[in-house]
Amino acid sequence: MLNFAYQEHVRSYYFDSRNQDFQFPPLTQIEHADVCVIGAGFFGLSAALELAEKGKKVIVLEGARVGFGASGRSGGQAINGFEEGIDEYIKQVGEDKAHKLWNMSLETIDIIDERIEKYSIQCDWKKGYATLALNERRMDDLIEMEKESHKNFGYQNMQLWDKTKLKQHLGSDIYVGGLFDSNSGHLHPLNYCLGLAKACVDLGVQIFEQSPVVDMVEKNGCVEVKTAKSAVISQDVILATNAYIDVLPKSIHHGINRKILPVESFIIATEPLSQAVADSVINNGMSVCDNNLLLDYYRLSADNRLLFGSDSSSEKDMVAIMRKNMLCVFPQLENVKIDYGWAGPIDMTLNSTPHFGRISPHIYFAHGYSGHGVALTGLAGRIVAEAILGDDERLSIFEGLKVPSVYGGRIIKDLATKIGVQYYKFLDKYR
């Protein structure tokens, strides 16, 4: 069940290996700001940082802890592009705007590079990412992806690998080949999130934890954001709750929760591997996922643990299921111990298209990253900040993308997710 109010971090490898330990106070008195951000994950902190760099007074309200959600639990893979595929966006918004969307997707990685360097964020950032195919039909999809990226956008950072080339870097026999992207990469998500929080605070941003928002009212040209104990009065508000949008009252989300399907993803972390064993798994430091609908994703951590994740719909025997999945890929890890296992929701949309926009002229949102959140959240923070500062050109392009709704509330969403997972399992088995 989704819940975040007053929660502490889940125990995970990321939490135990965090390099900063912030404890921000709860909101106890009325505060005023230019912008109030609801949610202290990647998107909320990225937007706050962009605005603070421009001199805005920003307050961030977090119902739990900084990086409590996917920003502190994800696989840490920063992937450019979009899950839906840029060809669909050409149909929706035309070639010119689709080219702008593609360029923005490349900017997502530049933003990570820039912030890590500018604010000295220690988060084990490493370039290199491969999407792998389990059969020839899915390899054809990767071949087409590389062809379209090069032909339509001139992207030259992708390399097609056949099975022989892949085996030079990955110790698994189950794949027929892959598509390597030298620009995408991976990082320690919680340490990156905590680094963003420190950068925000250093620029004067106020962060309040354990301060879930219970109501929001627009009046007299301002927005009053209410917590259980106090309120923030601001000119503009940014909703940055992502997969937890359903938990908020309708007076806050105004129905945009219908765009989001929270899908549970699970990760295990092995004990530290010897260098020889680590090299037998991945020897070039890349992060990896397959191109199943319910995909496996994995990478080595800075201390040589294998972090292995998959999507599912049940937390029952999660560690055992993840271990079985891991051994299907890397049977050489049969005797390796699992030190950690944790789960968390991903904010998916029905068509995997990100949902960015405005509820009103003073209330902004971005969510629905659909597995691309490590990278896309930085871009979302930048373009929402641009809109608040008076330039909404890039936000307007995202507002033109079609994102279908799911009606019927959380019970229907849970049912739809479970049915969808079973359907995807069927497709993955037979396609």
Swiss-Prot record:
GO terms for cellular component: cytoplasm. One of its GO terms (molecular function) is oxidoreductase activity. The keyword Oxidoreductase applies. InterPro entries: FAD-dep_OxRdtase, FAD/NAD-bd_sf. It comes from the Bacteria. Signal peptide: none annotated. Its EC number is 1.-.-.-. Keywords: NAD, Oxidoreductase. SUPFAM superfamilies: FAD/NAD(P)-binding domain. Gene3D superfamilies: D-Amino Acid Oxidase, subunit A, domain 2, FAD/NAD(P)-binding domain. The keyword Oxidoreductase applies. Pfam families: DAO. PANTHER family: FAD DEPENDENT OXIDOREDUCTASE DOMAIN-CONTAINING PROTEIN, SARCOSINE DEHYDROGENASE-RELATED. This is Probable oxidoreductase OrdL. It comes from Haemophilus influenzae (strain ATCC 51907 / DSM 11121 / KW20 / Rd). The lineage of its organism: Bacteria, Pseudomonadati, Pseudomonadota, Gammaproteobacteria, Pasteurellales.
